[in-house]
């Protein structure tokens, strides 16, 4: 595996919000739209994605601060993709790894922990894939979010996925799961916000949840020892910014973590292929990129969000592929599982 060592400023979107809006030819008046005027503009100016009149609730609490756009790091950037990998026109790992139970949608609740939740989800998938579906474990986003501080970021305020992958190498991460999951070391500590169909209602949420404390022990009543329950990685890197490199990485090793700029129009996404069209920059978000495809001659990435399975397309969304829309292809973080630690 070849890498290029770079000392660089990693960013979640290659340009500022205003610069990207200008670069895409988005009129100034469209950049400033919110609410019903924005919804009306989106419905008449594009046909790639359907729009919700009601915006995503707790939107500001689900995304990261703008300060997580930049970080100075010495990064291992994976060089050219494997030339022997044959890239299919579409790919969905759920169809290939049908026995992997880790391919489900998480719920980060009112906490900007997307960087930890998406990384834990990608690691869980990669463990299943690396073991040929013999090992099924949900990695704890809580362990990453609460204990990888300050090097990874600041818990519910946001963080950097590449640092979470590095934490997986050097500290290891225990088993986890969704809120109140039994028989795991450290399940997610924050309950889902509001009503979600027939799911258990735990209550509403107000503001951004405080980051829970780091506890280097398993929850009471679980017959697991924290240190023994750890799983480890053996490599962490940024994937080269090219469509083929990203596709090759996903095919070979499993889902990756993508970070992108979130604009006001994403708040109203309902279904279809998202492309930034209007609205101001609101923050940044990290998600699990699992595959790709094409619909009506539009290439897209297939992405798992962490806003419950009643958001978007059953918890997933698609975004245009090949144009680095919102910086989605610019900072792809990934890593290799140490199978001996499983």
Swiss-Prot record:
Presence of the UniProt keyword Signal in the record: yes
Primary gene name: AC-2
TM regions (residue ranges): none
Propeptide: 19-86
Any one GO molecular function term: cysteine-type peptidase activity
Residues carrying covalently attached carbohydrate according to the record: 99, 138, 198, 296
Function: Expression of the protease correlates with blood-feeding and suggests a role for the protease in blood digestion.
Family that this chain belongs to: Belongs to the peptidase C1 family.
Cystine crosslinks: 100-128, 111-156, 147-214, 148-152, 185-218, 193-205
Protein known as: Cathepsin B-like cysteine proteinase 2
SUPFAM superfamilies: Cysteine proteinases
Organism (species): Haemonchus contortus
Record key words, sorted: Disulfide bond, Glycoprotein, Hydrolase, Protease, Signal, Thiol protease, Zymogen
């Amino acid at each position: 595996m070849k890498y290029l060592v770079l000392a660089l400023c990693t960013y979640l979107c290659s340009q500022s919000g205003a610069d990207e809006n200008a670069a895409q030819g988005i009129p100034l008046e469209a950049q400033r739209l919110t609410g019903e005027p924005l919804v009306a503009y989106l419905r008449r100016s594009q046909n790639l994605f359907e729009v919700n009149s009601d915006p995503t609730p707790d939107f500001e609490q689900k995304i990261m601060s703008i300060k997580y756009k930049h970080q100075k790091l010495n990064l291992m950037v994976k060089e050219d993709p494997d030339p022997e990998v044959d890239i299919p026109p579409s790919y969905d790992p759920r169809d290939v790894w049908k026995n992997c139970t880790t391919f489900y949608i998480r719920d980060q609740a009112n906490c900007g922990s997307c960087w930890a939740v998406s990384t834990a989800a990608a690691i869980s998938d990669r463990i299943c894939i690396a073991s040929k579906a013999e090992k099924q474990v949900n990695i704890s986003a809580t362990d990453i979010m609460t204990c990888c501080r300050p090097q990874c970021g600041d818990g519910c305020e946001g963080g950097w996925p590449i640092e979470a992958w590095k934490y997986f190498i050097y500290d290891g991460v225990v088993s986890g799961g969704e809120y109140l999951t039994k028989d795991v070391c450290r399940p997610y500590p924050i309950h889902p916000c509001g009503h979600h169909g027939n799911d258990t209602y735990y209550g509403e949420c107000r503001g951004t949840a405080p980051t829970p404390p780091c506890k280097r022990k398993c929850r009471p009543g679980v017959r697991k020892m924290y240190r023994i329950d750890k799983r480890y990685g053996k490599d962490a890197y940024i994937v080269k910014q090219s469509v083929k490199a990203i596709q090759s990485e996903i095919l070979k090793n499993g889902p990756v973590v993508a970070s992108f700029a979130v604009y006001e129009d994403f708040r109203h996404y309902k279904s279809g292929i998202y492309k930034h069209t209007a609205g101001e920059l609101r923050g940044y978000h990290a998600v699990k990129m699992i595959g790709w495809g094409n619909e009506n001659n539009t290439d897209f990435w297939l992405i798992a969000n962490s806003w419950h399975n009643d958001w978007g397309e059953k918890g997933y969304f698609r975004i245009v592929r090949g144009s680095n829309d919102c910086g989605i292809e610019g900072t792809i973080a990934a890593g290799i599982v140490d199978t001996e630690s499983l």
